[in-house]
Amino acid sequence: MSRVCQVTGKRPAVGNNRSHARNATKRRFLPNLQTHRFWVESEKRFVKLRLTAKGMRIIDKKGIDVVLADMRARGENV
């Protein structure tokens, strides 16, 4: 399973660890992914999504129906 948010599309980013001596070693910044079930009243079913905490806030703000419509318009399988 890839580490990509289904709502925002956020992926792992690449950067550096920096020691006290400012030595750089490569590292990955991973998105804060959670698996969450949402009840979709219009479809009378649960939808299971893998999304970031930011994606959950977007669903709280816009509503699950609007977000699912956007995802389906992008071609996401839901």
UniProtKB/Swiss-Prot annotation:
GO biological process, alphabetically ordered: translation
What GO molecular function terms would the record report? Answer: structural constituent of ribosome
Q: Name one Pfam family in it.
A: Ribosomal_L28
Q: For this UniProt entry, what's an example GO CC term?
A: cytosolic large ribosomal subunit
Q: Which InterPro entries match?
A: Ribosomal_bL28 (IPR026569), Ribosomal_bL28/bL31-like_sf (IPR034704), Ribosomal_bL28_bact-type (IPR001383), Ribosomal_bL28_sf (IPR037147)
Family, as annotated: Belongs to the bacterial ribosomal protein bL28 family.
Annotated protein name in UniProt: Large ribosomal subunit protein bL28
In which organism is this protein found? Vibrio vulnificus (strain YJ016)
Its organism's taxonomic lineage begins at: Bacteria, Pseudomonadati, Pseudomonadota, Gammaproteobacteria, Vibrionales
Q: Which gene encodes it?
A: rpmB
